[in-house]
Amino acid sequence: MKDETPQFGKKLREIRLKKKLSQGDVSRILGVHRTYISGLERGARNPSLLTVRKIAKALGVNAKILI
């Protein structure tokens, strides 16, 4: 999934901003640190499939949109 991480991060940021959520908002919903969300958006961190599903659920979108 490493090659797809930057695309995932770009989509995550795009959807988060459309929903007017901060990285802090998303991190609180998921119970993770804000820097983790930042790392995902920058492509510095690789999310597991479970994490992708949790993020999709938190944002109210289908996980397929993110990956």
Which ranges hold each PLM region?
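Short alpha-helical DNA-recognition segment
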Residues: 21-39
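Residue-level detection of the helix-turn-helix DNA-binding "recognition helix"
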Residues: 17, 31, 42, 53
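DNA major-groove recognition helix of helix-turn-helix/homeodomain DNA-binding modules
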Residues: 50-65
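The alpha-helix within a helix-turn-helix
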Residues: 16, 27, 56
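Residues within the helices of the helix-turn-helix
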Residues: 13, 24, 53
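A short, Lys/Arg-rich alpha-helix, primarily the initiator
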Residues: 1-18
